[in-house]
């Protein structure tokens, strides 16, 4: 007998059906050939007895078998439902008394194939697992779509077209690193060539982004290496000679402050 789980087995015996046919009168005999059958059941006990005693004439064999099973206790197989010529439900149950049984398992026969009916627990587990996997995939997709930028103070959700443009632009940028060696104190005066249409100097656009990390490092090192232990970064004036603005090389119009 196969060690494969019974709820994953599809069993059939075309040779048996070709020899005996398949109908309600012999469907239990056909089922007894399958790995789902319990050979310690009351059905097997009665089959052994019927080999040595004659079934009364003019009595349906299935009804006679059913009447004998009612008189016994233990595991038994009965036909729970039938729809000839291609569908039957076989039920495995434990009989405690002539009127009391505990249902153990159902099997169904479709054509020549026999299957074990799945339990409700297995069905719900499978459906829940499928749902959880779908939700997990959706969450992963949402995480890929969302991008957090500290400068924007939140998440952004670029469109598919924007993603394609970013991807194409990243593929065209060479894998080289350029270092900005421009002196932080350097200031380019505004001329007619670098004035935009709105009247603002192009060198002042994005000024905060042009301040290099080197300028901040120099400012911090001046405080750390100072011989005066009472000097702190917040003690340095913001404007004027020796101020933070001067150290960073930022030109500020004090009239706008």
Swiss-Prot record:
Its main location: nucleus. One of its GO terms (biological process) is positive regulation of transcription initiation by RNA polymerase II. GO terms for cellular component: core mediator complex; mediator complex. Keywords: Activator, Nucleus, Transcription, Transcription regulation. One of its GO terms (molecular function) is transcription coactivator activity. It is found in: Nucleus. It holds the Pfam family Med6. InterPro entries: Mediator_Med6, Mediator_Med6_fun, Mediator_Med6_sf. It comes from the Eukaryota. Component of the Mediator complex. Component of the Mediator complex, a coactivator involved in the regulated transcription of nearly all RNA polymerase II-dependent genes. Mediator functions as a bridge to convey information from gene-specific regulatory proteins to the basal RNA polymerase II transcription machinery. Mediator is recruited to promoters by direct interactions with regulatory proteins and serves as a scaffold for the assembly of a functional preinitiation complex with RNA polymerase II and the general transcription factors. Belongs to the Mediator complex subunit 6 family. This is Mediator of RNA polymerase II transcription subunit 6.
